[in-house]
Amino acid sequence: MAKLWGGRFTKGTDKAVEDFTSSIAFDARMYAEDIAGSKAHATMLAKQHIISDADRDAIIAGLTKIKGQIDKGEFPFSVALEDIHMNIEKRLTDDIGEAGGRLHTGRSRNDQCAVDLHMYVRKAVVEMGELIVDMQKALIETAEKYSDIIMPGYTHLQRAQPVLFGHHMMAYFSMLERDFDRLLMVFKHADIMPLGAGALAGSTYGIDQTYTQKLLGFSRIYENSMDAVSDRDYVVEFLSFASLVMMHLSRLSEELILWSTNEFNFIELDDAHCTGSSIMPQKKNPDVCELVRGKTGRTYGHLLGLLTTLKGLPLTYNKDMQEDKEGIFDAIDTVHFALSINAAMIRGMKVNGSHMKAVLDDDFSNATDMADYLAKKGVPFREAHEIVGNAVHHCIEKGCVLLDLSVEDFKAISNHFDADILDAISIEACVAGRNNYSGTAPECVERQRNNGKIIIAAEKKQITEWKAIVESVQE
């Protein structure tokens, strides 16, 4: 098949080279963005009297027809035509003739590809924002549903201090809030228009980039044409966002895996989100959580891979940069499924609050509160720490816990203990006493939930603004 760029060559492209360099297998998903960009470019060319109005109308009608064919799955993509840009342009020229050949006037595949990816990433940011908000809502709903449940909090995966289950859920809410904030920067940098940069040096045709910018809804235009076609920072930033949100979901998944074991028995995942064993009939496996954990490393790989690709590239465009797309496309798909299915899992799980409380009643998670009790009586904290440590050791040897001791036992340990010590180190008191701003006391966690709803409202407003920009593109 003759190449649209083949005039300089005397030989056809080797089939192996075609297969190796073709990107149509993955960049076809940018067809809507490519067509929107081409329509805007043709409209601008006609406005500037670079092509005729008749050619513009033929181009736009032809592109509309092609989009309809692709939407219906009726468009035959060709590896020989390399990518989505050439596939569409070749079909357009076949359909409308000479006018189709004028579409590429004042444009290079370098700035064409760049503007497609910018628009695609903008759209992906909207999708990611909506998914984060839904996940945050699931966390708040679950924190409210189990608002009175107390669970062990952990350090080093050893029981440490009691916390409200809702406090634990809201910790993940805060992580996702930061993830949403990262999308702000991704969108800001994706919302810069590269079209008009040409191959690298700009255009001699008297194009109107400001007009094209308006048609495609971009907030600004690249100041430098060389930067415009070589910039992939916004892709790296998206992959960084994706890596961090997957890391947060992976940590949650690891906890859900642990909590759902018989050894913990803190939660039960819904049957709809688990799988069985081909040989062991009793098994209920948290495969979804395990896959989220596994796919996190894959997402990290896309980030590191692109950074490694970019680190040695001279300005401006190099074919290496084709490697930006498979990674970000896969990351978008991976984060989409991970967020949506985690939201469903959180909403569907059952929390075994009575068992969590029983675990706390049978261990030493209240030891810090016992030391705090002494410190508030004037005992230096380090001395109080030593006293309580000895008491814990004594209980371990006797096969009991601190709550099993009598007031007389406590007074024998230290004359600073009074009759109120057992109330002071009850599990409920341990939680209620931590009523500082970011603490786990019920009123603090309620404030976190209420603030979370305010944050979600602000995030939804931001998504609406993003959507307005994305949907302003004239197709």
Where are these regions (language model features)?
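A helix-coil-helix interface module used to build multimeric assemblies
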Residues: M1-G202, I207-Y211, T275-G276, D287, ...
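Glycine-rich cofactor/substrate-binding loops
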Residues: M1-G37, E98-A99, Q282-E475
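Generic, well-ordered alpha-helical scaffold segments in large soluble proteins
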Residues: H41, G62-Q69, R91, D95, ...
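Short, well-ordered beta-strand elements within core beta-sheets of diverse protein domains
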Residues: T43-I51, Y120, L164-H167, V236-L244, ...
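Conserved hydrophobic residue
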Residues: I50-I51, F75, F264-N265, P380, ...
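Charged, flexible cofactor/metal-binding loops and thiol motifs
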Residues: L117-V125, G129, E144, P152, ...
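Alpha-helical coiled-coil oligomerization motifs
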Residues: I140, E144-S147, K188-D191, I257, ...
